[in-house]
Structures are given as structure tokens and as C-alpha cells.
Amino acid sequence: MGYSNKYPHEIMSSKKHKKGSLVKKIASFLAVFFILMSAGYGVGIVPESWIDAIEYIASPLDGPQGLWKGDKNTGDTQTSSQDNAAVQGTRTQVSGTLNVEFIDVGQADAILIYNDENAMLIDAGNNPDGKPLTNYIKSLGIDHLDYVIGTHNHEDHIGGMDDVITAYSSEVDYIMLSEEEGTTATYRSVVEAADSSSAEQLTPKAGETYTLGDATWQILSCDTDMPDLNESSIVIKLTYGNTSFLFTGDATMNTEQGLEMSGYDLKSDVLKVGHHGSAGSTADSFLDAVAPEIAVISVDSESDMGEMYHHPATSTLQRLSQHGIKVYRTDELGTIRITSDGEKLAVSAFATSTDGT
């Protein structure tokens, strides 16, 4: 499969609509409807210039819509999107499906987002993961990466990134690393690989929005003034149609508090749990703000690094359970793939082949 060269551009965020009573909303809707009808527009056809002027009234699609019959060992499920764009005043059309894979790289992060035309990698595991991760991505037929992003400069997030960048070389469009300058050999290797590639290097800025085919992704946080590297993680919200994902890197409760105060729309269907499920992440108030149906934890098995770091923490798992959030863990299921058609999410899990076969 070929991956086209797509360029990002900053887009205007949706205008916030003032809240009114239901009666006023209905009256406004009917008024616009009759104006459009008198102008010769058919039912359901709205001129593009009117989109920002209309506040759509629709029933929310909250809540799971039943189970997919999948592998009983993986707990495959299908759920509708909580983030109903009709309620927010926009209708987004997408074509095809988008895959978001939380690749099993042990006590580390590597997230691959792709469809038939575009691909984006967020983090790349530890140093030994670089070549196996590259082999796995290539085994999917992906020969071009639109974006490669390192959420912060810890080895378990950028360790394998130099291998990925070197392997794809001229087939990487954009590279984004944290502005927090690192001092480790791992960091220097990634910077050297980025400098040697033909990719344009992007500077992360909170609020900036980019495109990935029909998907958009926005940087919500990248504060390098935080005292800890984890707290300066680049936090990204990805939206595809009426579905959304929040990727938090190793964000802590301090980062989460800043996000809650930022004014950004945090509500997302899927939450990548911060810092491998550590006790210092995933606060109750943050879960209230995000309101995810699904949470994914990228972590090593308890017999290995996970036990050393006590990840995921019992307290974090309890908070997720108390909020009624379905949890998927890479140490239990392997690589976790969530596929979106823009309206519903399908979850599957499998052992990752990293030998390129």
C-alpha cells in the first residue's frame, strides 16, 4: 500500500456556541429551516456558509451499543462515540477506517495511527525496540510516515525512534520532539537521525492543530517549564469523525490539572493512560473531564519491569473501575488495535509480529 505525502496545516478551532434554552434552540432551528426552504434548499442540504450559524439539535450517542462477537480471549468490543459532533454543532464526514495501535513494547510506549493513505507514530519504545518496531510497521505495508512524534525525551518513549527514522529516511515528512533538551546518548542519537533525514522538524505548540488525512490532531499540552520531564509530555487529542483519542505520554496529575484548567475540550472516547498507569497519574477529576469509555495502559508484565515500577498502580485501576471505564492492557493482551469508522470503535488485541513476516 502506498502512503501519500500529506502536509499539515493549522485549522481554525470550532466556534463555541452559546448555550440557550431548548425552546430557543428549536425556534432558531425552525427559523433557519424555513429560510433555507424558501431559498430553494432541500431538506438536509445546508450551504457551507451556514454551518457555523446553525446549532444542530440531536440525541447524543452516549454509551456502548453492544458487543462484537470476537475472540473471547481478547475481549473484542464495539462501542459508539461519546463525542457526538452533532451536539457540538459540527458534522464531520470521513472516508474509510482509521486504526490506532498501542503496540506491545513492554514498559514503554509506541502508538501507530494509520489508514490506507497516511501513518503517524507517537513514541517508539526503548532502545532495543527500534529495529523490531520498524520491521513490524513495514510488515503492515506502511512505506511512508507523515509524522513521527516523541512525547518527551525518556528512553522508554524515544529509545527506538532513531532506528525508525533512519529506516524510513526520506519517507518521513515531519518529526516533532519535545523542546526540553536532553543530555542522554539516546536523545543525541534521535536528534542526529532527525537531522540526517529529509523530514521537516516541527516545534510543538499548545493549541496547534494538524491533519492526518480525514483525521485531525491537536496539541493540548507541551509545557517545558514543568520540573519533571514526564510532566512536560506532549499531550495530543486525535479526532476522526465523531470519535476521539487522548494520548497523554507520561503526563502526571500536575499536567492533568493544567489540562483541566486550559479550556480545551478534553472529552474523548479513548484515553491512553498516563505514565503506564502510575499512581501519580489519572486523577478522578481528570477522568471526569475526559469521560472515556475505553482506557489503554501500555505496560510490561508484573513479572518484569511492571513489578519493579509498580505499574499499573492498584489505585489507578480502582479509579478507572469506579468511573466505569473498560481497561485494556498490553501486558495482558499484547498489541491493542482500536479501529474507528468515524462513528463506532472496534477493539481487538493480538501478539505483535516484529520479524517482518
Predicted features and spans:
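N-terminal Sec-pathway targeting helices
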Residues: 15-33
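Non-globular, low-confidence helical/coil segments that flank catalytic cores
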Residues: 2-10, 25, 33-357
